Swiss-Prot record:
Lineage: Eukaryota, Viridiplantae, Streptophyta, Embryophyta, Tracheophyta
Keywords assigned by UniProt, alphabetized: Cell wall biogenesis/degradation, Glycoprotein, Glycosyltransferase, Golgi apparatus, Membrane, Signal-anchor, Transferase, Transmembrane, Transmembrane helix
Cell compartments where the protein resides: Golgi apparatus membrane
Name of the protein in its database record: Probable beta-1,4-xylosyltransferase GT43A
GO CC term, one of those recorded: Golgi membrane
Organism (species): Oryza sativa subsp. japonica
Function text: Probable beta-1,4-xylosyltransferase involved in xylan biosynthesis in cell walls.
SUPFAM superfamilies membership: Nucleotide-diphospho-sugar transferases
Transmembrane segments: 20-42
UniProt cross-references to PANTHER family, sorted A to Z: BETA-1,4-XYLOSYLTRANSFERASE IRX9, GALACTOSYLGALACTOSYLXYLOSYLPROTEIN 3-BETA-GLUCURONOSYLTRANSFERASE BETA-1,3-GLUCURONYLTRANSFERASE
Sites where a glycan is attached: N176, N299
Length: 371
C-alpha cells in the first residue's frame, strides 16, 4: 500500500518536469531561429533606403545621360545674365569632380560639339561610334549635338542610349543652306551661342562624328589654358588622298604651319620670321593660313569674357559669327597658342570623308491610255 502511494505521487512530478523541458526547448529553438535571421538583416535603416532608390550610396557619382532639346527660331550670341545666374553656373574654367585618383582633384570640363550632316542612314552609326569614344574619356565631359529640328526625334532616341552626358540642340534656320559647309557653320554658331548663354566653362572642341581619335587626345586638350592646336590627318575615300595639316612646333610653342600631301609628296609650310610677326602674310597682305575647326580647341570663357584674353571689345563679334571670331583669335594670338602634343610630332585626330551619294531618279516612260 505504501509503495503504491509513493509511485502515484511521483508521476505528477515527472509530468511537470517533462513539460518544463519541452517549454525550454521551444524557447531555445525560437530564440535560435530569430537570432539566425537577424544576422542577415542590415545594420541601419539607411541601407534599406539605399536599396529602394531613396538616394543612398549606390547612386553613381556622375550623371551619365541628360537630354536638353532646345528648338530656337533665332540664335543670339548676347548671353542672358539672369538665366545664367538662375542656373548657378560660374565663370571658372575648372570643375571639381571630387575624384582623387592620381592626385588630380580638379579637371577642366570638356565641351565636345558635334554637328550633324550627311545621309541619315549613316548618321546613327557615326554618332554611336563617337559616343563609344567619349565614354572612355574621364569626366567631366558634356557632348553638345546640334542639328535641324526636323531630324531631332530620331537623334534624341540614339543619344538617350549612349551613356554620355549630352545636350541636344535642335534649331530652325532662318535661311536655306546651299552647301553642307554653310549648314555646319550655322550649327557651330548655334552651339557656341548655347555655351555662352549658359556659361558652360571648359575647353571647347568641334568633333566630327566621322572622326577617329587617339585614346590620349582628350587628356591632352584638357590641359589647354587658352588656345590649343594639333596636326589633323584627312583621308578621302573618293579621291584616295591623305593630307596632314597642322602647326609647326618647337616644344609646345607654335612657330608656323604646314600642309603635306602624301600622294604626291609635296609640303607647303609657313613659318613666323619674328616674335612680332603675328600674321605671316604674303605679298598681297592676306592671311597665309587658315585653321580647320577640327584642329583647335579653346577656353570657352573667350565667348563672354574676351577682355580676359586680351581682346578689346566686350562682345565676341558684332556679326554674331562666333566660330569665325574664335578662328581669328587662335591664329592671331599665338603667344597663348599651345601645340599638342609637345613638339606636335604625333597625329591624334583623323578625319575620314566619304563622297556624298547622289541617287538619280529614273523616270519610267509614261504610257497613254488608248481607247
Amino acid at each position: 500500500m505504501g509503495t503504491a502511494a509513493v509511485a502515484a505521487a511521483e508521476r505528477p512530478k515527472q509530468r511537470r518536469s517533462s513539460h518544463l523541458w519541452k517549454k525550454a526547448l521551444l524557447h531555445f529553438s525560437l530564440c535560435f531561429v530569430m537570432g539566425f535571421f537577424t544576422g542577415f538583416a542590415p545594420s541601419s535603416s539607411s541601407s534599406w533606403r539605399a536599396g529602394s532608390g531613396g538616394g543612398g550610396g549606390v547612386q553613381p557619382r556622375h550623371q551619365l545621360a541628360a537630354s536638353h532639346v532646345a528648338v530656337n527660331q533665332q540664335v543670339s550670341l548676347v548671353p542672358d545674365a539672369a538665366a545664367a545666374e538662375a542656373a548657378g553656373v560660374g565663370n571658372g574654367a575648372v570643375v571639381d569632380v571630387g575624384d582623387d585618383e592620381g592626385g588630380e582633384g580638379a579637371r577642366r570640363m570638356l565641351i565636345v560639339v558635334t554637328t550633324t550632316r550627311g545621309e541619315r542612314r549613316r548618321r546613327r552609326g557615326e554618332l554611336l561610334r563617337l559616343a563609344h569614344t567619349l565614354r572612355l574619356v574621364r569626366p567631366p565631359v558634356v557632348w553638345v549635338v546640334v542639328e535641324p529640328a526636323a531630324d531631332a526625334a530620331a537623334t534624341a532616341e540614339v543619344l538617350r542610349g549612349t551613356g554620355v552626358m549630352y545636350r541636344h540642340l535642335a534649331f530652325r534656320p532662318e535661311e536655306n543652306f546651299t552647301t553642307a559647309d554653310a549648314e555646319a557653320h550655322a550649327q557651330r554658331n548655334a552651339a557656341l551661342a548655347h555655351v555662352e548663354k549658359h556659361r558652360l566653362s571648359g575647353v571647347v572642341h568641334f568633333a566630327d562624328a566621322a572622326g577617329v581619335y587617339d585614346a590620349h587626345f582628350f587628356d591632352e586638350i584638357r590641359q589647354i589654358e587658352a588656345f590649343g592646336t594639333w596636326p589633323v590627318a584627312t583621308m578621302s575615300a573618293g579621291e584616295k588622298k591623305v593630307v596632314v595639316e597642322g602647326p609647326l612646333c618647337s616644344d609646345s610653342k607654335v612657330v608656323g604651319w604646314f600642309s603635306r600631301d602624301f600622294n604626291d609628296g609635296t609640303t607647303r609650310a609657313v613659318t613666323y620670321n619674328t616674335e612680332a610677326d603675328l600674321n605671316p602674310a604674303g605679298a598681297a597682305g592676306t592671311r597665309a593660313h587658315t585653321i580647320d575647326v577640327s584642329g583647335f580647341a579653346f577656353n570657352s570663357s573667350i565667348l563672354w569674357d574676351p577682355e580676359r584674353w586680351g581682346r578689346p571689345t566686350s562682345l565676341p563679334d558684332t556679326s554674331q559669327d562666333s566660330i569665325k571670331f574664335v578662328q581669328e583669335v587662335v591664329l592671331e594670338d599665338r603667344t597663348k597658342l599651345k601645340g599638342i602634343p609637345s613638339d606636335c610630332s604625333q597625329i591624334m585626330v583623323w578625319q575620314y570623308t566619304m563622297p556624298m551619294q547622289v541617287h538619280a531618279q529614273t523616270s519610267t516612260p509614261k504610257t497613254h491610255n488608248r481607247r
